[in-house]
């Protein structure tokens, strides 16, 4: 009887250890997923500090080929952006909206109107091909909505997921 009780305890311990081992990877994945964008360099509670540049999304403009998210060209009249490779996140931000807020000193280029604007991510600004790591490449419509002058070329902003 003592041998049977010892065997039962050993089996129970082995089962408990196996269950604990099987549960560990899912906890690790959940922990990584939960902190995904907040662990990125430069992220603050108010969003990601970035440099906003002007990009043409229409065929034949300086933006290059069709948008990475849908394979289409877009009107420069749309509130749309391309994000640097890390922020584009392999397409996970495709068709999602972000909120763009010019920094106070960044508003010099055109005075500034609205404090923030929401735009849709449609493309990647490829950091492996010359785009800097902190770029929000936006349509002229985004600049107009913020009351900024596109001739200034770039302006400091903060952006966040909506």
Swiss-Prot record:
The keyword Signal applies. This is Putative ripening-related protein 7. Its main location: secreted. One of its GO terms (cellular component) is extracellular region. Gene3D superfamilies: RlpA-like domain (2.40.40.10). Belongs to the kiwellin family. Keywords: Secreted, Signal. The lineage of its organism: Eukaryota, Viridiplantae, Streptophyta, Embryophyta, Tracheophyta. Residues 1-30 form the signal peptide. It is found in: Secreted.
